């Protein structure tokens, strides 16, 4: 384990000092544009390998809703030198685990294995980066698989897709920000082989990806493997990142949906926040505000809505509607989600939220409140970075979004530097904009 340093807050911030790791990070860029990050740590005999492609469901073409998710599935259907279903077999036979996931702004694939299997993981990832098996049979099979996922996880589950699928079309107007990234049955069924090949050619170029290796390995040996397997993958043009910008509304927008399976009404509220890339310092105040409002029994909305008013059975504040707050581009939402009690109304809950935000903006934080929240958030980041896989995913996202993989070491200091005034100003800003409100009406009989 790398010896920790001690981070002390700037003047006006909370008083605790946080020990944070200083993980070494080495950066290499191959001739084909592939960015490679090495973060060795000999603590445990495991390695994590991840490949992050700079494309998520906000970049998929209009008329092909869910295509980024579908293509993630296609990447597991074999490649030039790896048969169908052999990728999982190879990883599991080596004692490892694997997965992939599609996010608003990236798609990731990873393996976590014993350190002796590093070369295997790099070979597998390089082979599918070079030549995945995009065939009509694989396409049709995976369309059916994704459609079944939608049935199970959204259509036939209480609160399925709430609010990550159902709130964005209330909060945003453009297709990239508002559409359902999980997938639409009709548009998935219309996907063609040409669509898949075009998507691969455009977004799955080595120059549009970040390869990360963390854990128990020798960087010199790893670089030899990387150059052997990835070095001769042909370079292709990389799409320029488009803007998803939308203006912040001045008026509230409210919509209502019915969930035939939900036993209780629910409420989701979205507010706009500063650009998480262009204004990271400003954005971090909202990260702490989310925990001030809803993390733990002592948080403000937990005390007010759950314990005092008993208007909701649970409340959660978060940044974004899907994934880590640090992985997304602008715009994203500060989201409140609550499951209402039987006799509660959405207007009553919203009025109480406004009161608590106003009280926080006017009266400020109480003694020790910011320190408690900072300690929780920093502890969560430290736990995430403590294992090889969590570290790999964090490092890759920071490189992809900001070109700063070292943020895995620096974020605790950045959070410790946020002041109480910045958090209260963030609370005030939520009251000064037109929020987006989604009411979910219960369609099922209430449970006891």
Regions found by a protein language model. Name each.
Residues 33, 41-91, 280-293, 302:
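Active/ligand-binding-proximal structured segments within catalytic/core domains
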Residues 33, 51, 69, 91, ...:
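Buried hydrophobic packing residues in well-ordered domains
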Residues 147-166, 245-264, 307-319, 363-409, ...:
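Short acidic/His-enriched helical or mixed secondary-structure segments at domain edges of catalytic enzymes
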Residues 268-272, 293-340:
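A structural supersecondary motif
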Residues 2-18, 210-212, 360, 368-448:
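C-terminal regions of mature proteins
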Residues 2-13, 173, 181, 206, ...:
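An aromatic/glycine/proline-enriched structural segment found at the starts
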Residues 3-45:
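N- or domain-start disorder-to-order transition segments that initiate the globular core
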Residues 2-8, 13, 53, 79-80, ...:
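Acidic/histidine-enriched segments that form metal/cofactor-coordinating
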